[in-house]
């Protein structure tokens, strides 16, 4: 997050009315003429007068964007939109046209000529904080405190936010749930076109997935408040986390006659995949490249449950494939009492355990509807391999775009570091390795390495995942000081090819 200190001045100084309107005009220039016209028409249609000025009240905002009541986020987003205006009265929320325009510019990515991406993220997260309006009244009027903030580095600004702000954990959970439910929403569509996502039995699965994502944002499971810095850091590792909000709020830039028209869906039902599902696809689209976003560009190349649990079968399918690929591993955690009926589990003898397993929160922190086995059974791990696979008896493959990730029971992303290039290993006599190393003399695989690493045995039956500091892969954001490892029994393993030649549909990314 290296930013020049002067970039923050525009956010925190008290602007005059003329400066505020001039900046708003700069935002509006990033909208095309038709978008500006539609925005004004839509605003006029639902506006009411307050002290001679046209505004949107909360009911108008809620009616227009149609966020389902089950999500309970309309007041949250209305307050966020109001915070982009100049009215500092904590007891009076009023959404003016200029505030709505600035809100839309930030959420839909039309802020590039005025704010950096980091500044936009900062403004959005600040607008989610319960203490934000009070902060603007009491702190921004203190010129000395403003000056200190303006001339601070990013770390000081993050610390300042954490000391003065707080975001309700329940709001961020609902936000995660909304994003998973509208992951296929396209610009110009209303949420009503996807209302079934909030009604069918899948909604329970989406609630559980939202909890996984929430745990990845904040390690403070027992706290009802999330630190703003946690969200800032999470957006760095999941840069497309809020992209669906851009599509949701772009509705204001389309003519009213088009709001209930569903855009032709180009997404297949994923029937040909063993592990990949619409929900898992929604999660990986938070952080993987845009070429992954369209399902019609993805192909299931290898499924262990179909092609066989064999490194030879995996080699036949993968070593002639030249595009990037996604590895997904669906597994059950191995605990002390676990016994395998198919093959003795000798992993502990081969690779002695160094760290305890990771327990996500406490029983009280996990909703009862998610089940008693939430902590210690299912695990879903994966890797994005940016280069072609190859036999690596002597070395490794992959590049700096390679990454590891976990989706269940916690959503985390582990990016490649600059410490070494031991990203991926494919050795039929050893198995699959990520972030491991080899002895310089004997060439034997070394499992006792620092950093984040993953190993799958040569029978594709069991493996381990370790999170312990920096190595070939970085530790998860907000979990840098956590050290743990998981042993697991593989239920299925799938490799998915990514067609990078298919054109990616353009979309405005808000964050």
UniProtKB/Swiss-Prot annotation:
One of its GO terms (cellular component) is nucleus. It is found in: Cytoplasm; Nucleus. Keywords: Cytoplasm, Nucleus. Disulfide bonds: none annotated. Pfam families: TLD (PF07534). One of its GO terms (biological process) is response to oxidative stress. Its main location: cytoplasm. Residues 274-499 form the TLDc domain. Signal peptide: none annotated. Belongs to the RTC5 family. May be involved in a process influencing telomere capping. This is Restriction of telomere capping protein 5.
């Amino acid at each position: 997050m290296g930013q020049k200190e002067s970039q923050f001045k525009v956010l925190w100084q008290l602007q005059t009315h003329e400066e505020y309107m001039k900046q708003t005009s700069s935002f509006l220039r990033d909208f095309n003429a038709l978008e500006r016209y539609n925005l004004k028409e839509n605003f006029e249609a639902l506006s009411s007068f307050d002290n001679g000025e046209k505004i949107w009240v909360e009911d108008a905002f809620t009616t227009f964007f149609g966020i389902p009541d089950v999500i309970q986020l309309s007041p949250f987003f209305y307050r966020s939109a109001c915070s982009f205006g100049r009215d500092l009265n904590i007891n009076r929320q009023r959404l003016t046209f200029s505030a709505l325009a600035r809100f839309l510019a930030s959420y839909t990515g039309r802020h590039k000529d005025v704010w950096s991406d980091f500044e936009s993220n900062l403004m959005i997260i600040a607008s989610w904080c319960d203490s934000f309006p009070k902060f603007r009244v009491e702190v921004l009027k203190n010129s000395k405190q403003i000056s200190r903030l303006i001339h601070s580095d990013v770390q000081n600004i993050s610390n300042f936010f954490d000391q003065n702000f707080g975001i309700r954990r329940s709001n961020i959970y609902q936000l995660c749930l909304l994003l998973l439910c509208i992951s296929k929403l396209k610009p110009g569509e209303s949420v009503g076109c996807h209302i079934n996502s909030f009604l069918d039995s899948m909604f329970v699965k989406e609630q559980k997935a939202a909890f996984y994502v929430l745990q990845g944002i904040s390690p403070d499971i027992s706290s009802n408040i999330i630190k703003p810095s946690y969200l800032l850091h999470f957006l760095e590792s999941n840069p497309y986390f809020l992209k669906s909000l851009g599509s949701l709020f772009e509705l204001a830039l389309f003519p009213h006659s088009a709001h209930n028209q569903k855009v032709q869906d180009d997404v297949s039902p994923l029937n040909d995949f063993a592990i990949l599902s619409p929900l898992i696809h929604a999660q990986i689209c938070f952080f993987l490249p845009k070429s992954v976003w369209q399902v019609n560009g993805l192909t299931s190349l290898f499924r262990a449950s179909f092609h066989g649990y064999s490194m030879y079968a995996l080699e036949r399918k993968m070593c002639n494939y030249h595009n990037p690929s996604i590895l997904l591993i669906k597994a059950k955690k191995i605990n002390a009492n676990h016994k395998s009926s198919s093959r003795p589990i000798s992993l502990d003898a081969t690779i002695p355990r160094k760290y305890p397993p990771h327990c996500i929160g406490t029983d009280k922190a996990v909703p009862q509807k998610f089940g008693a086995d939430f902590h210690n059974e299912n695990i879903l791990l994966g890797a994005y391999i940016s280069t072609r696979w190859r036999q690596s008896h002597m070395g490794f493959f992959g590049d700096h775009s390679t990454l590891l990730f976990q989706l269940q029971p916690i959503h985390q992303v582990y990016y490649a570091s600059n410490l070494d290039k031991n990203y991926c290993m494919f050795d039929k006599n050893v198995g699959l390795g990520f972030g491991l190393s080899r002895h310089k003399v004997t060439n034997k695989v070394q499992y006792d390495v620092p950093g984040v690493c993953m190993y799958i045995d040569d029978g594709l039956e069991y493996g381990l995942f370790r999170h312990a500091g920096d190595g070939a892969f970085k530790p998860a954001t907000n979990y840098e000081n956590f050290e743990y490892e998981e042993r697991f029994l593989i239920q299925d393993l799938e490799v998915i090819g990514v067609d990078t030649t298919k054109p990616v549909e353009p979309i405005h990314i808000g964050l």
